[in-house]
Amino acid sequence: MPVIIWINGGFGAGKTTLAEELHRRLPDAVVYDPEDVGLMLWKWIRPNGDFQHLPSWRELVVATALSLRKHHAETLIVPMSLIRDAYRAEILDGLADADEEVLHVFLEADAGVLRERLNARVTHPGREWDQAAREFGMTGLDEMVAAAARQPGGTLLLRSDRLTPAELADEVLARVGLRQVHADDKRMRQARSLERAQPARSSAPSPSWPPTSPGP
């Protein structure tokens, strides 16, 4: 099942929870969090408030995904918000241009639900990082809710405020299985086309070598 499952959605939509549930069912998959790429960049350059604005982040996110797929895992699970349309298109198109199968999932939830989840979230107890992360998430809450209507065709839209993590995972894996059938059919059609394009082999016997000398 070679595929990249990109889990998009607003902060508090349940991306990490769904990624964990999918990984539980697909233990050979790799969970790849592009946030780590941003934190790595911030070790070398001055933090800019949102690493998604960095062209290097967007380029490295694609390059890292391709390398992980090539060397380490057939299936990647990527929980990462891509709310800005241009950034989403740049990254997903970059993966598609490399002939990667990508299932783009967008988790929807009402603004009130997202707000409650963000207020209840504690990642680093007692640290200012948690408060800063909550404030960052709250700032773009309306934009994150509105983004659901702007997702490209082929996106799997799921309501994370109405479905359990297990039900969400069921929907994702059902779509992955369907895509895999289509991918297998496509490969079979391509193989048949190549066979038809090959020149037909002659049925005439091959001449012997060395040639037989003529008799007396």
Task: Give residue ranges: language-model regions.
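Glycine-rich phosphate-binding loop used to anchor ATP phosphates in small-molecule kinases
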Residues: 53-106
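The conserved Walker
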Residues: 11
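Conserved glycine(s) of the Walker
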Residues: 14
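Small-molecule kinase domains that catalyze NTP-dependent phosphoryl transfer to phosphate-bearing small molecules
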Residues: 120-171, 180-209, 216
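Hydrophobic anchor at the beta1->P-loop junction of P-loop NTPases
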Residues: 7
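Walker A (P-loop) ATP-phosphate-binding motif of ABC ATPase nucleotide-binding domains
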Residues: 4
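Conserved substrate/cofactor phosphate-moiety recognition/catalytic segment
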Residues: 17-66
